Amino acid sequence: MPLSYQHFRKLLLLDDETEAGPLEEELPRLADADLNRRVAEDLNLGNLNVSIPWTHKVGNFTGLYSSTVPIFNPEWQTPSFPKIHLHEDIANRCQQFVGPLTVNEKRRLKLIMPARFYPNSTKYLPLDKGIKTYYPDHVVNHYFQTRHYLHTLWKAGILYKRETTRSASFCGSPYSWEQELHHGRLVIKTSQRHGDEPFCSQPSGILSRSSVGPCIRSQFKQSRLGLQPHQGPLATSQPGRSGSIWARVHSPTRRCFGVEPSGSGHIGHRASDASSCLHQSAVRKAAYSHLSTSKRQSSSGHAVEFHSFPPSSARSQSQGPVFSCWWLQFRNTQPCSNYCLSHLVNLLEDWGPCTEHGEHHIRIPRTPARVTGGVFLVDKNPHNTAESRLVVDFSQFSRGSTRVSWPKFAVPNLQSLTNLLSSNLSWLSLDVSAAFYHIPLHPAAMPHLLIGSSGLSRYVARLSSNSRINNNQHGTLQNLHDSCSRQLYVSLMLLYKTYGWKLHLYSHPIILGFRKIPMGVGLSPFLLAQFTSAICSVVRRAFPHCLAFSYMDDVVLGAKSVQHLESLYTAVTNFLLSLGIHLNPNKTKRWGYSLNFMGYVIGSWGTLPQDHIVQKIKHCFRKLPVNRPIDWKVCQRLVGLLGFAAPFTQCGYPALMPLYACIQAKQAFTFSPTYKAFLSKQYMNLYPVARQRPGLCQVFADATPTGWGLAIGHQRMRETFVAPLPIHTAELLAACFARSRSGAKLIGTDNSVVLSQKYTSFPWLLGCTANWILRGTSFVYVPSALNPADDPSRGRLGLYRPLLRLPYRPTTGRTSLYAVSPSVPSHLPVRVHFASPLHVAWRPP
């Protein structure tokens, strides 16, 4: 007989009106393969091969074939970034604050000071791929908005700018591992000896250099550890070669000034004397190139003097440029039409410099004039479409045979989070502004994380079919005017109102490397999680009567009363600011007693999903079609949403197993009215996940394939199955019987599958029912040899093993609570003691 919905409800024990047999008879029936097959057929769960066209959209969920078209906003504001500088001695500052750090805290802080990134191999892409043509209708607008965003990041000290093959410049405060260059000289900041001659010491820089003459550049080969010294002739590179910024040292022998002070006192002292003026003739440049600081091969193919003109002439490039600049070339030409760019270029007398240099120059490993990832802009988030966010695509490191396997780190699961945070504390959450950009990257990582652009001329040339620019050679003037068009002219005129003289600066090629960790690399979330968890660990030890917890950049503080929380907030904020961590005070949220964290609402009653997720699920069920095959890609999105809320339903994850099966088979899934009604009933009533309590286990379950046994206190029970069952199924049934007979929330078992509380591998009906019966039950592992229920399960009722005293302590998982936080009293004291709430009495860990 075909199964009716009522029958199905009866089987799932979800309906009290229909009479069900005793649990001991009903449950083993649910494990029957034949019954599960019939139910699957009745609910159309197994019929994966369908010939009707698939549905690719359900509500807001789209499949593989209909991705949402990104919307470009010409009014996007570039967010401002504070001058973020995380203090290098962060570990020492934490020690002053809380006393000696634990091993875990030290290790994590060392990991991010500085962060290192060495992929197995790096694929270099042409500069044209630097800014992605993500918005075909707004190409020029998107180009300038992105360039402005990159410029903002560079000014904020988040990016390096590649100056030559081996040097880069940046803004902001330098770190000790960033070796500075001054006019082509490497400067090592150490104590001065022999007058003011720099003394050779071993710098903690990019290069591990030999102790003999480490101040003079030798040839370096790149290795997995950045740059290693390579024995070879000294400074043999040809004069004028792009990439060598080092002044040539005229003495061929290697010297260290600490040993032989009479030698060449300053490295390349003639280099700075002979830094030639800007308008030297090409002949003199060639003749003196071994004395002047080396020429830089700019990405547009014209040699520029590096660091050789006085700052006063920085903005006066337009008066007598030495090299041909695509933008300024328009000034001296006849307009080719009403929409010629020369009209725009003649609007302004002084277009500013062609390139800007940072406040500091450092040496870097050899960096080609290429990019390793593309960038584009999107809305900052769904709620803030006024500001833009930069998306960096470094997916090459996660693909192919040379992909980097990113380190794994513990994400708190729902139960751990509830055990930890479900209490009657007052909560607030802190917003760390630009959290990723706090963590410094070693300059040796720069060649692997390059972004940039080939300049406006190449960008426009790629898009206009009538123009051909080969290898940066700007040929005749006719070629120059090939890029003039009405669309470009109108776009640039509008942008001129926004950016003014910077249009010229942004039209030049640029190559930038990351100085802080970028968001598009799998290493970054790991590093951020390590960083914030270590900081929270320090805060927890400094304020033992409070709770601080973090996941990525989401930091929450809890205290017993609102007044206490406010004083804690002040102290913690000051501490974080002293480390160089930037908080956004406008985004501090005070939650009262119900904390909103990681998509959950956590209170003293337990945890539930946040309201916007519940609304999304309701909306999703309203739009869900029945008897129509739904694309498995859409099912993936669906399962993602329903899976998040599954622990709050009666049947949990097992209820979604038919959907998982269709995704695995990459087949369409058809919802029958019955299955949809069953699921929607599950999700309309959500139950909180409660905090586990410590206790003493007094109920034990055990099973063999043929029978089960229970030990409830001093009482023993046993029974046999009608037919032999697989051992895991039998153990699960025994646990269900123990729960239903004793009502205990703490059960001892020797089966690892039951302990894991993942019931998705059992027959579908049994998995759903077991999840429903065992919801909120905690399990304790007891070895078979000590299990009091072992004998009854084998049919031996006469033998009594002594009842174990098995204490149970709820776990907070691996949620980075390195310093054990003292337990928080569960009641609010009548009067909070305010003698000194922030006094730190340090005790050894």
Curated annotation (Swiss-Prot):
What Pfam families does the database record attribute to this sequence?
DNA_pol_viral_C, DNA_pol_viral_N, RVT_1
Region of interest: Spacer: 180-348
State the reactions this protein catalyses: DNA(n) + a 2'-deoxyribonucleoside 5'-triphosphate = DNA(n+1) + diphosphate; Endonucleolytic cleavage to 5'-phosphomonoester
Keyword Transit peptide in the entry? The reply is no
Q: What is stated about the way this protein's activity is regulated?
A: Activated by host HSP70 and HSP40 in vitro to be able to bind the epsilon loop of the pgRNA. Because deletion of the RNase H region renders the protein partly chaperone-independent, the chaperones may be needed indirectly to relieve occlusion of the RNA-binding site by this domain. Inhibited by several reverse-transcriptase inhibitors: Lamivudine, Adefovir and Entecavir.
The entry marks the following residues as binding Mg(2+), namely D431, D553, D554
Residue segments, region Terminal protein domain (TP): 1-179
Q: What's the superkingdom here?
A: Viruses
Q: Which residues form the Reverse transcriptase domain?
A: 359-602
UniProt xrefs under SUPFAM superfamilies: DNA/RNA polymerases
Q: For the region Polymerase/reverse transcriptase domain (RT), what residue ranges are annotated?
A: 349-692
The entry's free-text remark on domains says: Terminal protein domain (TP) is hepadnavirus-specific. Spacer domain is highly variable and separates the TP and RT domains. Polymerase/reverse-transcriptase domain (RT) and ribonuclease H domain (RH) are similar to retrovirus reverse transcriptase/RNase H. The polymerase/reverse transcriptase (RT) and ribonuclease H (RH) domains are structured in five subdomains: finger, palm, thumb, connection and RNase H. Within the palm subdomain, the 'primer grip' region is thought to be involved in the positioning of the primer terminus for accommodating the incoming nucleotide. The RH domain stabilizes the association of RT with primer-template.
Q: What else is known?
A: Hepadnaviral virions contain probably just one P protein molecule per particle.
Family to which the UniProt record says this protein belongs:
Belongs to the hepadnaviridae P protein family.
Q: What does this protein do?
A: Multifunctional enzyme that converts the viral RNA genome into dsDNA in viral cytoplasmic capsids. This enzyme displays a DNA polymerase activity that can copy either DNA or RNA templates, and a ribonuclease H (RNase H) activity that cleaves the RNA strand of RNA-DNA heteroduplexes in a partially processive 3'- to 5'-endonucleasic mode. Neo-synthesized pregenomic RNA (pgRNA) are encapsidated together with the P protein, and reverse-transcribed inside the nucleocapsid.
Question: What name has this protein been given in UniProt?
Answer: Protein P
Gene this chain is encoded by = P
